Structures are given as structure tokens and as C-alpha cells.
Amino acid sequence: MDNINTTIDICGAASGLPSPGDSNSKRLRHRKYLPQRWKCEPRGPARTETQRPQTLFWRPWLLKSHKPKTQAHPYARGLRENPQEQKPVEYNHPVRLFWPKSKLLDNTYQEAADLLRNFPVQATISLYNDSESDTDNEEDSSEEEQDSGFESE
């Protein structure tokens, strides 16, 4: 076994095939002459020419996914109006959640935790004026006017 090159990478690395200058290299190039441990056996069913992909490179946007839509969005499992119903609730993005200004500082952390647990969708919280916050704002503005009046004297 003279002139054996163990660094040639064929099917199994370091296969021990003879170097190209060896007289026995032509004989050992064919698979039938290789020892069984050096042979590359196909893994799976044989492919025909028609089954080969048309492109050489993997392009994920060309592949068709066979996964159902619910598997693509794992958070959607908790968004059902009716638990017996199989279809999850659909939301059009961007989602806006309206939060009253009167509840801005009252129990905000607990309510926000409950909100995130029951509504796990990326959304923008938009504050709105409710009846309680309108009266608070009027009182605040009248106090500011009175304070500013005292400062000017």
C-alpha cells in the first residue's frame, strides 16, 4: 500500500485512497473495487432526474410550506373568543389598545400584567380621555390658573 494519501475527502474523510500517480488508482476509482467501509451508499430512495430541484441553491421563498397557519404563530392559541371554536381570532395590524387616562397610575402594573397575559399581541397603547379624567383635567387647569394668578401679584 505505497503512495496512499489519507487526506483525500471522498464520501468518508481520510478514506485512504491511493494518490493519483499510483498505478492502481484507475482500478480503485470505481466503487466496486473500494472496500465496503469506503463506499458511499445513498440514504433514502433513489432520485431520478425529474425529481431533482431546478435550482442548485436553497431559496426559502421558493419552497412551499406545508405547515398550518396556527403553527407559524404559536401565540395565536390563546386568542380564541370561543374555546370550542378552532379558528383563532384574527387581528389587523397595527393593533391599538385604548387605555383611559384615569387609570394611568392606578394599579397600572397589575392591569398591564393581566393585559399581556390575555392579549399577547404586539400593540400600541393609546391613551384616551374618559369622564373621570376630564373632570380631573378641569380641576387641574383651574388650580394652575389660580396658582399663576397668585404668582403674578
Swiss-Prot record:
Summarize tissue expression.
Expressed in the presomitic mesoderm (PSM) in the anterior halves of somitomeres S-I, S-II and S-III.
Which keywords are on file for this protein? Developmental protein, Nucleus, Repressor, Transcription, Transcription regulation
- What positions does the record give for the motif labelled WRPW motif? 58-61
| A Pfam family per the record | Ripply
Where is the stretch described as Ripply homology domain? 93-128
InterPro entries found in the cross-reference section? Ripply_fam
Name it: Protein ripply2.2
